[in-house]
Amino acid sequence: MEIRLEDVGYTIDGQEIIRNLSFSLKSGQKAVIAWPSGTGKTTLLKLIFGFTIPTTGKIFIDNQLLNHSNVKHFRKQMSYANQVADLPKGTVQNSMDEIFSFPANEHIRDYKSTINNLLSEVRLSSEIFGKNTEELSGGERQRLTFILCQVLNRPIWLLDEITSGLDTDNKSNIVRMVAEASQTVLISSHDTIWRENNAFTFINL
């Protein structure tokens, strides 16, 4: 799926967060937003996901203008993962069961074995299924959320500081897996490790 922004701006409480931003991502393209702190990286991802609407300009998903009437449809085509990684309460297993019971996800039948197969790629063990989500470290939450992106297999990934706080090996694994994915991916990150892989382009202010 393609993403295109035309002169997008966003202002809140009189403060201009994003101004006249235009760019496009072709299907399967991957780009990193590496702007300084406080310049609207996370806000941009939320605008594309439809959490809020631009003050000015237009956002297109597959050449369709994102608006109130189609935002729910397009959200089902996107996975949004952030550094907070808010997971349902209970054990990780119960949390996964709840997520895959949602109407948008219930078509994914064999999610348990798929998740289990992916755990080793992000250096987690199957013992994590028995942990309570409230006991997980930030890094464990981030890696689980990234696994969810892979299992949900939606055509667009929006990744907000997905490598923040991870060690070098885990960062490298995540970067490699994102680079190898077929999805259209937009990443918000300060991490310079993304520049070490030529699969990614960079969006400037």
Regions found by a protein language model. Give the residues of each.
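Helix-to-loop junction immediately C-terminal to a conserved catalytic motif
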Residues: F49
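Hydrophobic anchor residue at the start of the ABC signature
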Residues: F146-I147
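Conserved ABC transporter NBD signature motif
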Residues: G57-L65, F74
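Q-loop/switch helix immediately C-terminal to the Walker
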Residues: V84, G90-H107
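Conserved ABC ATPase signature
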Residues: N132-L136, E140
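Conserved ABC ATPase "signature" region
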Residues: D110-I128
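Catalytic Walker B motif of ABC-type/P-loop ATPase nucleotide-binding domains
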Residues: W157-E161
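ABC ATPase C-loop
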Residues: Q150-V151
